[in-house]
Amino acid sequence: PGHGEGATEKGDLESWDEVNKTVQDSFRKIESCDTKILFGHSFGGQVALYSILSDLVNPDYLILSAPTLGDNYPNFVKKLSSGIAKIAPKLRIPSIVNKKNLSTDIDVVNDYFNDPLVFRSMTARYGREAINTQNFVNDNINNLKTPTILFHGENDTIVPIASSSKLSELENVEYVVVQNSKHELLNQDTRPFVLSELHRWLKNNNII
């Protein structure tokens, strides 16, 4: 899976503007398309929601898979993140992802942890920016008007399913709870079900 090859330092960014630029540059490539769909899994879901809610991009449809509207980092760490980022911006904070909570497929787990492009930690300033944007998304989630399908695994402990509760209640959001699923909805035995539900939603919206 990896986290990309472009970054000079994995799991680090000076400001969220770097993320905004990447999203906008990528979205320009599909702006001429008749139907523009944004897909975001996990942290990518948070990025997609932030980009829409801050009017950076305006897709026609949105597909979300376990977006990070919450997490299992200790509250005291999150509360201290801003101060830590100022004092020690490059202090590394370990990832909460482990071999037990990622996927029900052992091969997927092994591939993930053997991939040199996957980072196992983030800097304090990265964490600060992630928390700030997560808060922005949660505070403004009622402003989301884009037709959306939201998937979340019932047994997800990386991004607790309860964090999708407010988003799932919006009229423009179709919510699909994936039973017996960990975080990697599309990379385990739940993949056929998720793809089937996605196909149904795409057909119902006359996208395919």
Spans of model-derived segments:
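Catalytic active-site module of serine/aspartate enzymes centered on a nucleophile-bearing elbow/loop
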Residues: 174-208
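Alpha/beta-hydrolase
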Residues: 91-140
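Gly/Ala-rich beta-loop-alpha elbow adjacent to hydrolase catalytic centers
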Residues: 40-44, 48
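Short beta-strand/loop motif that positions the catalytic acidic residue
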Residues: 144, 150-152, 156
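Catalytic nucleophile-loop/oxyanion-hole region of alpha/beta-hydrolase
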Residues: 4-30
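Short beta-strand immediately N-terminal to the catalytic nucleophile in serine-hydrolase-like folds
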Residues: 38-40, 65
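Flexible "cap/lid" loop of the alpha/beta hydrolase fold
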Residues: 53-88, 127
